[in-house]
């Protein structure tokens, strides 16, 4: 298995598909990486030489924020919003939907399981 950005990518899959196993790299980015490094998108990971894997690794390190760094960056952005006390930060702090969804009904994923209220059944 090839190891790129701390992730073991599957060897039997095509290179662009295998690169999407890295957090922060989607389909478009994976195809752009293959094009930039000069690797055919139809090749499989087990067909790559060590030099090609090294080229992919260096390109990702130089141009993309991936895995732990990306997660840390997202968490810092959320923390910044919460510290500012803006509306989005308050919604994060209260574990409510941030992007304007309704909360009268639904939003159970964000709010958690429904809390039982005594005397509700009538």
Curated annotation (Swiss-Prot):
Keyword rRNA processing attached: no
Name of a matching Pfam family: Ribosomal_S13
GO CC aspect terms: cytosol; small ribosomal subunit
Keyword flag Ribosomal protein: yes
Molecular function via GO: rRNA binding; structural constituent of ribosome; tRNA binding
UniProt-listed GO biological process terms: translation
Assigned keywords, A-Z: Ribonucleoprotein, Ribosomal protein, RNA-binding, rRNA-binding, tRNA-binding
Residues covered by region (Disordered): 98-122
Entry function: Located at the top of the head of the 30S subunit, it contacts several helices of the 16S rRNA. In the 70S ribosome it contacts the 23S rRNA (bridge B1a) and protein L5 of the 50S subunit (bridge B1b), connecting the 2 subunits; these bridges are implicated in subunit movement. Contacts the tRNAs in the A and P-sites.
Family: Belongs to the universal ribosomal protein uS13 family.
Subunit record text: Part of the 30S ribosomal subunit. Forms a loose heterodimer with protein S19. Forms two bridges to the 50S subunit in the 70S ribosome.
Name of the featured protein: Small ribosomal subunit protein uS13
Organism: Ruegeria pomeroyi (strain ATCC 700808 / DSM 15171 / DSS-3) (Silicibacter pomeroyi)
